[in-house]
Amino acid sequence: MVVHELFAYLCVPDTARAIEFYAKAFGAREKMRLTEPSGRIGHAELDFGGTTLMLADEFPEYGITGPRPGMGTPVTIHIHVNNADEVVRRAVDAGATLEREPKDEFYGERSGCVRDPFGHRWAIGHSIEKVSPEEMQRRYTEMLAKP
C-alpha cells in the first residue's frame, strides 16, 4: 500500500462561517465548495499554503456532527507557521478561544493552542531548534520528574 496524501476533514455547524474564520485567522484560501439546494455545504476545500483542509456542514441524519460546546475534542490540528505568537493572536482576534499562550517547548518548538469557534483545537507552532528524539525524551523525562 502507498499513501499519497492525508487530509484533515472537519465537520462544522456552519461551513460558510468556518471558511471566513480560517481565512481571517490562518490566511487559508477557498479552493472549492459543493452546496446543496438547501444551502447546506456538503464539501469544501481550503488551501493552507499548499496543504488542503476539507470541511463540511453537519449531516446529523448520517451521524456526522462537529464537536459539541463544552465537550472537548479528541483531535488537535497542528499547524506549523513562521511566527506562532502572531498566528495565535490572529486566531484569537478572529474569534478563537485562547487555551494556551505560546511558549518555548522542550521539543524545539514555540507553540500555543486555541479552540476555534466550531470546537476544533489547533496547536500553532514554529521551530526554534532541532532536537533529536533522544534529547527530546531526556527533556520530557526531566520535565515530568519536576514537582
What do the predicted segments below correspond to?
Residues M1-Y9, E20, F26-R115, G125-P147:
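Vicinal oxygen chelate
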Residues F118:
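C-terminal catalytic core of tyrosine-transesterase DNA break-rejoin enzymes
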Residues V12-A16:
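Short acidic-aromatic low-complexity motifs
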